[in-house]
Amino acid sequence: MRKIIVTLVSMLLGLNAVAQNKGIDFLLNKLYDGGKSNYVMIIAHRGNWRNAPENSLQGYKQCIDGGIDGIEIDVHMTKDSAIVIMHDDTLDRTTTGKGLVSDYTLEQIKQLNLKSPIGVVT
């Protein structure tokens, strides 16, 4: 059940990130048009991770400004049951932290820095 809730929250957050740009009704109509449209929906994986830190507000803003239809995100739960946006189960690749997201509290994660797409601390 917990995994289902986390999945639903991540889907809603991803749609909400772009809803103000094109409108949620526009996106939902394209998702549920029964295959009648030739529209190709563009979804950014982990935000604009090639040009900004992965899953960062900067990357999401670039996606929205660029007209992207949606942003795919993954969510994980911290040790104190807070939900954070993180692609990996671990912090090592994209932050200055080490180990599992679930081993850290939200306050501890807030003390970490993100890394750029080439691993430079931001």
Identify the residue ranges that each predicted region occupies.
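Bacterial Sec-dependent N-terminal signal peptides
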Residues: 1-24
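Metal-dependent phosphodiesterase/phospholipase catalytic core, i.e.
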Residues: 21-33, 40, 87-122
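Structural preference for beta-strand elements that scaffold enzyme active sites
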Residues: 41-43, 70
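Conserved, mostly hydrophobic/aromatic
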Residues: 45, 63, 74, 109
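Short, acidic/polar
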Residues: 52-62
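Conserved beta-strand positions in the central sheet of alpha/beta enzyme cores
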Residues: 71-72, 85
